[in-house]
């Protein structure tokens, strides 16, 4: 089944797994494998259901609980994910406070991204900021270990430790949190937070109850409202942008976000640096040209990439709101390289924006991602295309 999944034969992989489950329905590894196959196909709801079945075979298994929580967060089911992680955190400490104390980036980053997809900017910004603080703590705490390591004379481990500290900002969780925080800052700049309106449309987190013997510091701003009011300006992102420009030059999404942040701030120099990294380090000259507002010559574009076609379609819509982007995105579909599911979703949104025909496009994408229709429904449930 794993080999079939690697070859993108989703139906064949699921058939093998169903046969195995019929033989041994109590083997949770089969459910985990099925969840991964479904996730790769875009069927995130069915993937979460498979993880639920695996987790319920042994509720005391922490790995299964964390995997189930992450699958729920992919679907935007934040409240249910909170309930799942409560199985193994301390009973006398609120779940979110405990996860923050544990520096659980694996939960906080996807949870923040789920809030972002919902449009809940304050809570998303709060969690992204928590993760950024974790990495600051990692760097600051290193100084407690220098003397200890030298006293123990474990110089090989010390050498590895120094290299690990140098690379801490290259971590994928840091990049995702940094990009998410910048997006939140841009959203707050475009539409400043109306606290009264937010309180009317969202249920605020109640204050925690201190049980006897429980020692923890209250989070006085669990919903991020005070944080947005105090540190919700574009200038707050200066340090984050500096780290991304140093350690994430090869991350295309990070460079696009830095460019958008710098353009909104009016920082021409930073825009040029981000575009140069996209062009020279990420090897995406079309992305750099599009962001800089340069005209992309259609004849010179490699149309075997759906990502390139999306850029052409967006350029056509900019120049002419009634442009036919359907043919740009779908012509000679069979000659294209296999696109990523995120590119497929972005192309779907472009078609919807241009009021194009989306049903045939979804049918084409399902040749690659059997669960794409489900993926679109989940994304559009929270996001406006």
Where are these regions (language model features)?
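Acidic, Ser/Thr-rich low-complexity linear motifs
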Residues: 94-102, 137-153, 194, 291
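Residue-level signature for tetratricopeptide repeat
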Residues: 2-3, 37, 69-71, 114-115, ...
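Short coil turns that delineate tetratricopeptide repeat
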Residues: 25, 59, 93, 136, ...
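Structural motif corresponding to the intra-repeat A-B loop/turn of tetratricopeptide repeats
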Residues: 6-7, 41, 75, 118, ...
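Acidic, serine/threonine- and proline-enriched intrinsically disordered linkers and terminal tails
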Residues: 182-234
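"A position-specific structural signal for the A-helix of alpha-solenoid helical repeats
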Residues: 33, 67, 108-110, 117, ...
